[in-house]
Amino acid sequence: MRSDAIKKGHLKAPNRSLLRACGLKDEDFDKPFIGVANSYIDIIPGHYFLNDYAKIIKDEIRKNGCVPFEFNTIGVDDGIAMGHEGMLYSLPSREIIANSIETVMNAHQLDALICIPNCDKITPGMLMGALRVNVPTIFVSGGPMASGVTKKGEKISLSSVFEAVGAYEAKKISEEEFKDIECSACPSGGSCSGMFTANSMNTLCEAMGIALEGNGTILALSKEREELLRKAARRICEIALDERFKIRNIITQKAVRNAMVVDMAMGGSSNTVLHMLAISREAGVALDIKDLNFISSKVAHIAKIAPSLNSVYMDDIHKAGGVSAVMAEISSRQGHILELDALTITGESLEERLKNAKIKDENIIRKVDNAYSKVGGLAILFGNLAEQGCVIKTAGIIGERKFKGEAVCFNSQDEAIKGIIKGKVKKGNVCVIRYEGPKGGPGMQEMLSPTSLLMGMGLGADVALITDGRFSGATRGLSVGHISPEAAEGGLIGLLKDGDEIEIDVDAYTIHANLSEEEITQRKKEFVLPQKEVPSRWLRMYQKLVSNASKGAVLDME
C-alpha cells in the first residue's frame, strides 16, 4: 500500500503514535487509507451542507473496511464575489485548491481519494490536484439546487437576479417584483440550478467517467443524492488498491474528448474550455483550443438549459434521462464522435454504462434530428482580435450570429458597469472590456454584471460584448470572452479605440477589427501599457506566473 510509507515497520513508530492520537487502532494499520477531500464552507449555498455529506461518506468507508481521513479545501462563491475586488480571487483559487489536494495527499501518502466538490472553481481545482497525485479517485459533488419560482409562478435562477438588476435600473420592473426575484431565485442548498459553470463541470466529471451516473443532475439535499454518496464511498473502497483506476487511467485523451462532446451537446459554460485546457495539461493529455471547433461541428446541441432556456433546469434534465441519455442519443446518431471504449470508474466501458440509457422526455432532451442546432453550444473564434482564440457560448446567443458594430472601450469591468448604467453603450455597439485577462486583472474576472445589465436594459440582442476576461455560466447574449493574447500582453484588444469597427461571425468562427496593418503597426508604436497597482502579494505572484486563457490560465514555471 502507498500508505505503508507512514504506517509500516519499526521506523514508523512515531508516525503510528500520532495516528493513534487520531483514534486509530492496531487493526487499522492493515487497511487502506482514503483521503476525503471536502470543500465545506458556510458562505457558499452549494457547500454549507457538505460537512454532513462527508460524514455519510466516512461512515460508509469505515463499514467497507477502509480508514477515511477528511480534509478541506478553500472555496470561493463566484456569485457573492461578483461585482467587486473579490472576483480577482476566484480563478486564482483554483490553483490553491489544486495545490492543497496535492499537498495533503502526498504529505500523508494516502492510498485513494474521494473528492466532494460542487461550485465554481472547486471541481476543476480538485481535478487538477488529483491528477498530480494519481491514485484511485472518485468525484461525487454536492448536487444542483432546485430552480426558484416567483409569485407569478415563473421558474427562475440566480441569473434572473443579475438580469433583474438591469431591468430595475431601466425601471422595467417594480421594487416589489425586484424583491420577489431576489428572494425566490435560490430556494435551497446546491449549485446554482442552471447549466452554469458548477453544473457544467460536475456534468463533465460524469462524462469523463470519474463520477457515477447522476453526479451532474441529482438534486442536492435529496435522498437520491445521499445514496449516490454511499455508492461512491463503497466504490472507492473496492478500487483503493487497484492501479487500473488511478485517475490518469480514467481521465485519458478519450475521456477528455467525451467531456467536450457532452459540453457541446448540452451548451455548457464557456469556463469549461478554460478548465478543460488546465485539466488536460495536468493529465498529460493534448487538448488544443483549435480542436474544439471540429468537435462542435460534429455534435448537435440537444439539451438547452437555463440561462439559455429559462424553462429548463438541471432537475428537469435528470428526470428526462440525465447525462447518460444525452450521451446515448449522441452515440446512436452521430457516428463515432464519442469514445465508447473509454474506461469509467465503475469498471464499465462508457458503452456498457450507456446500454440502458434513453431519453424520457423529448421536450427536455431532444433527438438529434430535432436538435436546437446541428452544431455544439460552444465555439472558438479566431482573427486579428484573437490570434490565439477566444470563446463564445453559442447556446446563449439570443440575437444574430453575425454582428458588426462600433467599439465602445472600457479599461476595466468597473468602468464598464458605470458606462453601461450611464447609457454609453447603445444599440449596435460592441462593448469592449479589457485589462481583465489572467495577467491584466489579474485574475480574469467574470463579466456577469455587465452582460446582465445589458440584458435587463433590453440591449441583449442588439449589443455584442468582447473581453479578455471571462463570463459566468449564467451569461447569455453575444458575449465573446477569453480573448488571447490579452491586452496586458500586447493583444490587439488593448489597441482598440472608440468607434473602431468590429466584425463577429460565429458561423465562420471569426472575430476581426477592421483596421489596416499600417494602423495597427502605428498604434503598437504608440502603445503604453497602463499601470495597475496590485497590492496583494498573492495576486502579484499569480500575475507573474499565469499563462493566457488559450492555455487554460495555468501557472507556468517554464
From Swiss-Prot:
It catalyses: (2R)-2,3-dihydroxy-3-methylbutanoate = 3-methyl-2-oxobutanoate + H2O; (2R,3R)-2,3-dihydroxy-3-methylpentanoate = (S)-3-methyl-2-oxopentanoate + H2O. Pfam families: ILV_EDD_C, ILVD_EDD_N. It is an enzyme of class 4 (lyase). Its cofactor is [2Fe-2S] cluster; Mg(2+). Gene3D superfamilies: IlvD/EDD C-terminal domain-like (3.50.30.80). Keywords: 2Fe-2S, Amino-acid biosynthesis, Branched-chain amino acid biosynthesis, Iron, Iron-sulfur, Lyase, Magnesium, Metal-binding. Binds 1 [2Fe-2S] cluster per subunit. This cluster acts as a Lewis acid cofactor. GO terms for biological process: isoleucine biosynthetic process; L-valine biosynthetic process. It comes from the Bacteria. Homodimer. PANTHER family: D-XYLONATE DEHYDRATASE, D-XYLONATE DEHYDRATASE YAGF-RELATED. Functions in the biosynthesis of branched-chain amino acids. Catalyzes the dehydration of (2R,3R)-2,3-dihydroxy-3-methylpentanoate (2,3-dihydroxy-3-methylvalerate) into 2-oxo-3-methylpentanoate (2-oxo-3-methylvalerate) and of (2R)-2,3-dihydroxy-3-methylbutanoate (2,3-dihydroxyisovalerate) into 2-oxo-3-methylbutanoate (2-oxoisovalerate), the penultimate precursor to L-isoleucine and L-valine, respectively. HAMAP family: IlvD. NCBIfam families: ilvD, PRK00911.1. Belongs to the IlvD/Edd family. This is Dihydroxy-acid dehydratase.
